[in-house]
Amino acid sequence: MKTYRDHYFLKAKQENYPARSIYKLKEIDNRFKLFRQGMKVLDLGAAPGSWSLGAAERVGPKGRVLACDLQTTDTQFPPNVTFMQEDVFNRSEAFEDALAAMGPFHVVISDMAPRTTGTRFTDQARSLELCIEALAVADHCLIKGGSFVVKIFMGPDVKQLLDALRARFETVKTFKPKSSRVESKETFYVCLGYRGDGQQD
């Protein structure tokens, strides 16, 4: 198991990414073709910045990435990435202005995860709260036909999230990348074809 984990950790360091999570996003994009040149992407829970870097590469210099996280990061981003230190549960006026100025977005991605307590039920409940808030942000700024990717710690209460996703998107897929740790409870919902009517629910 340790060798398996170290493979992605070392690969990330060799390729100048701040975290191994970059390979999860690459697997998701290779499978579902989320990104195209010139797209605008919103990255929630972006620190330390691997997903933002990966998205920036795939949308190219004419694309834009707005990244935010409760924590700051010292990652050096390319010119097409804007990073803001923000709490998605208490969004500042400056962040709302950035959403309005840079949006609407073609893709919203969320790798947000709670600080784990070691108590499975608590961690799953907090993960679900983050997913629901990420979806609320997506409802606010995702274009019709757009895509949404969100990380969830699987548990008994995910049905309410799945129901909300299926009401908003044409296609909802469950995907666990090979680069996820085998013992991890995380998985990703990959949602395609936003209907554009989430705010009316």
Curated annotation (Swiss-Prot):
Pfam (any one): FtsJ
- An MF annotation (GO) of this entry: rRNA (uridine-2'-O-)-methyltransferase activity
InterPro entries assigned to the protein according to its UniProt record, in alphabetical order: RNA_methyltr_RlmE, RNA_MeTrfase_FtsJ_dom, rRNA-MeTfrase_E, SAM-dependent_MTases_sf
Reactions accelerated catalytically:
uridine(2552) in 23S rRNA + S-adenosyl-L-methionine = 2'-O-methyluridine(2552) in 23S rRNA + S-adenosyl-L-homocysteine + H(+)
Localization, UniProt: Cytoplasm
Main localization category: cytoplasm
Recorded hits in PANTHER family, A to Z, give: RIBOSOMAL RNA METHYLTRANSFERASE, RRNA METHYLTRANSFERASE 2, MITOCHONDRIAL
Q: Which family does it belong to?
A: Belongs to the class I-like SAM-binding methyltransferase superfamily. RNA methyltransferase RlmE family.
The protein in question is named Ribosomal RNA large subunit methyltransferase E
Organism encoding this protein: Nitratidesulfovibrio vulgaris (strain DSM 19637 / Miyazaki F) (Desulfovibrio vulgaris)
